[in-house]
Amino acid sequence: FDEENGGWVDRDKLEPKHFKKWVEFCKARGLGCDFNPTFFSHPKCDPLTLASPNEETRRFWINHGKACIRISQYLAEELGQPCIMNIWTGDGFKDIPADRMGPRMRYKESMDEILSEPFDFNLVKPCVESKVFGIGVEAYTVGSAEYALSYAAANPGKCIPLMDNGHYHPTEVVSDKIPALLTFFPELALHITRPIRWDSDHVVLLDDETKELCKEIVRCGGLDGRVH
């Protein structure tokens, strides 16, 4: 939505000027502002986005991601605080695909192109986020945990890992993953949520896992800016 002119702008055409009111809101309250591309709920989800075999579809979403890099840079410069820009897609399949490798290779190529957009890594922190499954993609998620961690590890200075504690198998806990990742990554980001049986995004409570997350951030020295 183009707040400046009262019209609609498609996602691949978004510009920093469309977010002036966001900056005004944050400045008035002394806040920074994180940002994310939105790779879902759009006619050009076929249903894949960055992993789509359709070049026109994939190009649209790459351009959206690059636009969001520019917007994130603008937000960080205006507000004087780093902007965490998270990349997550719901790309996947409801049943077992014949080709598990192809979509991930296309996703990687798309990510590489998005991150080729110039930005200051001190100001913009692109993240890559995984998910174990979603409604309609129960059998195969392109951006699996192994994919996301491997991509972040292969792109230091361009990308950091992000963990959402609702995006793993119910028997996994993100609190245990924090020290493992901080052993190898200078920085990481978290989405702290409250999953009930799956990624339901209930309002966060001070429950046992939330306490353990906070304990590990402190114990691992994450309060010095390593954990976002």
Locations of regions flagged by a protein language model:
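Active-site capping/gating regions of soluble enzymes
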Residues: R100-H228
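Extended N-terminal export/anchoring regions of large proteins
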Residues: E4-N5
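Catalytic domains of carbohydrate-active enzymes, especially glycoside hydrolases
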Residues: F1
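Active-site acidic/histidine proton-transfer and metal-coordination neighborhood
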Residues: V9-P156, I160
